[in-house]
UniProtKB/Swiss-Prot annotation:
Keyword set, alphabetical order: Aminoacyl-tRNA synthetase, ATP-binding, Cytoplasm, Ligase, Nucleotide-binding, Protein biosynthesis
Keyword ATP-binding tagged: yes
Organism: Francisella philomiragia subsp. philomiragia (strain ATCC 25017 / CCUG 19701 / FSC 153 / O#319-036)
Reactions this protein catalyses: tRNA(Asx) + L-aspartate + ATP = L-aspartyl-tRNA(Asx) + AMP + diphosphate
Marked site (Important for tRNA non-discrimination) residue numbers: H30, G80
Residues bound to ATP: R218, D219, E220, Q227, E483, G535, V536, D537, R538
Principal subcellular localization: cytoplasm
One annotated GO biological process: aspartyl-tRNA aminoacylation
Subunit structure: Homodimer.
Protein name: Aspartate--tRNA(Asp/Asn) ligase
Gene name of the record: aspS
Entry's family note: Belongs to the class-II aminoacyl-tRNA synthetase family. Type 1 subfamily.
Annotated positions binding L-aspartate: E172, R218, H449, R490
Subcellular location(s) per record: Cytoplasm
Length: 589
């Protein structure tokens, strides 16, 4: 039907006849001449119909979002009427033939007025919202990114192999989405939370290098950066170590950013241990663009009478830290500090102590804060020296159980960085390594990553000696405070895998029921292997500079995991339920 896309129409086509197809983005009538901006996924082009044109009457009947096909001759625009914002902005098409392919009702919101439109309306009419150029550009970037990744992995010897969607429910952390079986009454498939076990089985099978761009499903409470169904770049390789995965993947990600948005990363990426990340930033995914760090002052506060600090300072499970904000006196009003005090309360902090440094030569008199009178001058200036604070700076303090300090001060660090844009660079990729193998909660061990992650020990005896302090062979890639990928070297021996299940409170019987096929496979000559998975949606959020994951998915769910457009999930017929042997329990009113 068409000869050219809108953005292809330029001065090189002057005096040539072209045919375009698209939507009427805007219609204007100037002195009897009709000007149309025609939109397709590449952009806009101006179409002009003079009164003497045989298609003028049809052009006069057009309204917004009508779908048209038009043929005309490309002319240079009159001098002074060029539009530098358009690829086609130096030319216009003098219309000769015009066909209305389809009319449109008045759309529920104007594409140029999307910011004042509620998200529920935009999600209900998603096919309208996706006509916006900024939305289309995000999905075009997504397509380019996935194509780049596929090409990179193909060129590096990885095989694209599909794994099942209908599989077995296994305890991987979040709840599974279950699919009832019609053939096996009372039994259920589960949609995979990841292809983890299947990709490891492919390594047992000898495929050596695997990848897949795959949908995964998790029935969990949603956040701004979570969806019930999401896309992973899933990767696994055999006869490798951490260095291979990390060097190969950072080349892929560096190339991806360069190819899609022209951003060049220095390689190799910075590597930081989990312990260092938590110690300095209170987060295992620190945003290293922000030049704010924690300074540990626990020892300095142990003998102070100020119980707010000395209490946690003498608690082995607590932390006391200071964080310097350079030039904070000018930035941080009392109102702003009160706002931050409420903010850290979200993370369990009971308050937010601070000191403003007005002078370093007047003792306590040069320090402004309600807490100054409660702490000795010697300790105060020791803390100032430790943090490197100068006149005009502000110190914030965290003193509580380690998790509360890490969560609250880590979030405060990120918020201050964002609020005042105190970034030292645009991009900060890094690897975080040496994660704990397990974490303890309610007197029980849980896997920090997943139960197939290899520990940094080689024998069952070492594994059971001190499991709470074991490190794992896991690694996460972090960019600007987002964990974009996570992986590990896997357990490749049956005895080690069985013992990890035991340490996690999974009995031999339960392990056999849930993972018997995997344990069997590990006894048939399994190579050393490992891999990683990247969240496509989060990567595209970074590449398109958006904070809402729904903006980078064509048809996303709401935060209640529903689709306003299709009205899913929905009721099904009693006949369907009976076929599946399912009875729906009515909610108590």
């Amino acid at each position: 039907m068409r000869t050219h896309y809108s953005s292809d129409v330029n001065e090189k086509l002057q005096n040539q006849k072209v045919t375009i197809c698209g939507w009427v983005h805007r219609r204007r009538d100037h002195g009897g001449v009709i000007f149309l901006d025609i939109r397709d996924r590449t952009g806009l082009v101006q179409l002009v119909f003079n009164p003497e044109s045989k298609a003028f009457k049809v052009a006069d009947s057009l309204r917004g979002e009508y779908v048209i096909k038009a043929t005309g001759t490309v002319n240079l625009r009159p001098e002074g009427q060029e539009n530098k914002n358009l690829a086609s902005g130096k030319v216009e098409i003098i219309g000769e033939d015009l066909e209305i392919v389809n009319k449109s009702k008045t759309i529920p919101f104007q594409l140029d007025d999307f910011q004042s439109t509620g998200e529920d309306v935009k999600l209900k009419y998603r096919y309208i919202d996706l006509r916006r150029p900024e939305m289309q550009n995000k999905l075009i970037t997504r397509s380019k990114a996935i194509r780049y990744v596929r090409n990179f992995l193909d060129n590096n010897g990885f095989l694209d192999i599909e794994t099942p969607f209908l599989t077995k429910a296994t305890p991987e952390g979040a709840r599974d989405y279950l699919v009832p079986s019609r053939n096996f009454n009372g039994k259920f498939y589960a949609l995979p939370q990841s292809p983890q076990l299947f990709k490891q089985l492919l390594m047992v099978s000898g495929f050596d290098r695997y990848y897949q761009v795959v949908k995964c499903f998790r029935d969990e409470d949603l956040r701004a950066d979570r969806q019930p169904e999401f896309t992973q770049i899933d990767i696994e390789a055999s006869f490798i170590d951490e260095a291979f995965i990390m060097s190969t993947m950072e080349k892929m990600i560096a190339g991806l950013f360069d190819a899609t948005i022209g951003v060049k990363f220095d390689t190799p990426f910075q590597v930081m241990t989990y312990a260092e990340a938590m110690d300095k930033y209170g987060s295992d995914k620190p945003d290293l663009r922000i030049p704010l760090e924690f300074v540990n002052i626990k020892e300095d506060m142990k003998n102070e009478e100020f119980k707010v600090f000395s209490g946690p300072a003498n608690d082995p499970e607590a932390r006391v830290v200071a964080m310097r904000v350079p030039g904070g006196n000018d930035k941080l009003s009392r109102k702003k500090i009160d706002e931050y005090t409420k903010f850290v309360g979200i993370y369990g902090a009971r308050g937010l102590a601070y000191i403003k440094i007005n002078s370093l030569s007047e003792g306590k008199e040069g320090l402004q804060s309600p807490i100054v009178k409660n702490i000795s001058e010697e300790t105060l200036f020791k803390v100032i020296e430790k943090t490197g604070a100068q006149v005009g700076d502000v110190l914030f303090f965290g003193a509580a159980k380690a998790k509360i300090v890490n969560d609250s001060m880590g979030a405060l660090r990120a918020k201050i960085g964002e609020d005042f844009e105190i970034f030292t660079k645009d991009w900060a990729p890094l690897w975080v390594v040496d994660f704990p193998m397990f974490e303890k909660d309610d007197n029980r061990l849980y896997a920090v990553h997943h139960p197939f992650t290899a520990p940094k020990v080689d024998t069952v005896e070492e594994l059971t000696k001190d499991p709470e302090n074991l490190l794992s062979r896991a690694y996460d890639m972090v960019i600007n405070g987002y964990e974009v990928g996570g992986g590990s070297i896997r357990i490749h021996r049956q005895d080690m895998q069985a013992k990890v299940f035991n340490l996690l409170g999974i009995s031999d019987e339960e392990a056999r029921e849930k993972f018997g096929f995997m344990l069997d496979a590990l006894s048939y000559g399994t190579p050393i292997h490992g891999g990683i998975a990247f969240g496509v949606d989060r990567l595209i959020m970074l590449l398109t500079n958006t904070t809402n994951i729904r903006d980078v998915i064509a048809f996303p769910k709401t935060q209640t995991a529903s689709c306003l457009m299709t009205e899913a999930p929905s009721n099904v017929s009693l006949e369907q339920l009976n076929e599946l042997g399912i009875a729906v329990k009515k909610e108590d009113k």
